[in-house]
Structures are given as structure tokens and as C-alpha cells.
Amino acid sequence: MRSSHQICASITDICNVKNGHRDRQLLLGNGFDVIESSENWAFGYSLKDGYKGYVKEIDLEPFESKTHWIKSLGTHAYIEPNIKSTDQIFLPFGSQINVISKAKKFVKTKHGFIPEQHTLPIGSYLSDAVQVATKFLGAPYLWGGNSINGIDCSGLIQAACLACGMKCPGDSDLQELFFPEVKGPWCKGQLIFWKGHVALTISDTELIHANATAMSVTIEEIKATLSSIDAAGDGPVTHRSQI
């Protein structure tokens, strides 16, 4: 029987099988509907994008409504409304929380006190997906990653889109199918797809992407990236979209 849960860990993996490799990640407060459970693993799907897989049962708790989400790259929940007090848990960008009350410049949650300036109400969004993506500049590359601790190409695109109120699948192949194709000259806010990879243009000459060459999120010239990917045998471009 299906049951609604949410993530109670800072970050958890969605795996292809029990004890399998990481396909994607979910963040604190993200909803996850459980279809079945066995051997300490729950099979189900993410509420933000429908992504299916296995999550450790220990990282799940019953679903509850949330009031705010984390808009900073990351933040901490403190035991008191004081930056010098003990921090209890790290909340990555995109985590969701339920604010109980406000105290000084903090919001009180069951996780502890979080700096209010790092939060936005649920239903309020950022306005520039490119600007969001550049927040992650220098973040380490991690296959299937969805946070500042480690992120991959499609995770970066999804984080930028969801933060701006746009729906976005989790993997690059699904993103390619989801976003309509465009043609014409390069401009800011275009998604460039290759087989198994995606990047986002930040201008008519540069793009940002999480890549395994640099093992981080980098900004590069569009022409240079097109040439290097083609030279590596992973070209050509298969699709372009505007977000």
C-alpha cells in the first residue's frame, strides 16, 4: 500500500536496486511516496519529479506539510537561535522545512534554528535560473548528485529550474525530452544536450556545466566545449532548449 513519507536525513541516495548504485539524491524534507518496503529499503518515487528507486528506510519519516525551502547553497540548524551554538544538521539548497515560529533572525523548526535569510516560503521562487546555476560554481562533480556537496550535469539543471518554479525531470535524457527544441543563435538560458550530458548557457559565448573532465561545476566557452566534447567522441549536440 502506498504511503507518503519525506526525507529526514540531510541528503540520501535514490538507488537502482537495494544496496545499489546512486541514480539521484533527495534532500531534507523532500517528499517520497513508498510503494513497498523490505530489508530496510523502501521502493517508491520522489514527489518533486516522479523519480523511482530505492531509499534507505532509516532516512524516511511520515510526510508533513512544509512552509519554507532553503534558498542558500546550504545552511545549518542550530540548537539555539545563536550562530555560536551547536549546529545539528546541514540543510542543502532545495531542502524543505516547516517553520514553527520565528526567533530573532532565525526560524524555529523541529531540526533546530535556521537563519531566516536562508529561507523562502513554499510557492515563492528565485527569478533567474542561470544565476542559480552559477551559485554552484566550483562544486565537486558527483554522479547522481543533487547538492553543493556533489552534483552532476542534470542535477545542476534541475536545481536551477525547480528554484525558479519550473518543472524539470531528474536525468538529462528525460530533460531533453521534456524541454521543447529551439534553433537560432546562442543566448543566455539555453540548454545544450549531448548523449548523456547537458549544459546551460550563461551568455551567447559561455556555458556552465557539472562535468567529469574538471570533476566540478565550471564555466567554459561554448565553442571550446563543443569542440572538446566532439573530439572525445561524445558529440554532436542532440538537442537545444530555452528555459
Predicted features and spans:
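Structural motif
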Residues: N30, S95, G189-Q190
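Active-site nucleophilic cysteine motif
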Residues: A133, S147-C164, P169
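...with weaker cross-activation on analogous glycine-rich loops/strands in unrelated enzymes
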Residues: M166-K223
